[in-house]
Amino acid sequence: IVGPAPFSTTRAELRANADALRHEALVLEAMPDGVESTLPTKVEWFCFPDGAQLQRRRRAPRPRFRTFVMANAGQRTFGVCLQSHQRAVCAPAADGVEAERSLWVPFVVCLLTRLPIIESLRRWLQRVVWLLPADGTQTASPSLRDAITALLFEVPQPIPGALRVSITVPGCADARGGGDGDAMVEFAVPTIARLPPLSHRLWPLLRQFGPQALLELLACAFGERKILLHSSTLALLPSISEGLCALLYPLQWPHPCIPVLPRALMEMLEAPQP
């Protein structure tokens, strides 16, 4: 679980300083216990690429999903994030005036894996969104902890092209958002005898770029040109960049590829290599 570093502020300070709404992100809790030392370096930057930004709204923002990819020494780590918000407790302003809008603090439940099972993990998170803590503690509730523990230790790893794993997530809403019944989620890895398995779907790439623009992108990639993708929707960037790399098969992109670049790493855009 990733969220903003502890902070203390008043409503008057928030009204006077917009920067007070943005805080550095920290790993608040990791499961299983003791795994903090093996987490990828600065994984919290990728959970909150633009920093942990508080929001002033009358109602809580809707939960949002996003993904990221980290590479180190040829090993790729996929991250699937579910961002939700909790109401913050603010110290009263000196003038005693209460703001009409509540202050909402973001936190992220992030699942890390080296298997290309992004969509399966996304569906799993969609089922457990109802288990997120609602008391403002920003720690895993007992029900959420039990669900994550079962996913980590009781589910066998799928075998490419041979073993598909289906698990039941109890006590969650069904696909229509109603009820309180069980939900089934399937994990599968394609066989290695075929094309490399895709970590993301190709349709966002095909939808966002027409044939001409896609051909120009592929020409730049084959020519090892620097490619910078910008979008106001962070969830699109991993799908587009991973899809573009997949279309290079049987060749591979030999240079660093960061689908979502955190604000803290912006200086990497000045690097001379692609």
Question: Which residue stretches match the model-derived regions?
Answer:
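UDENN/dDENN subdomains and adjacent acidic, S/T/P-rich linkers in DENN-containing trafficking regulators
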Residues: 1-274
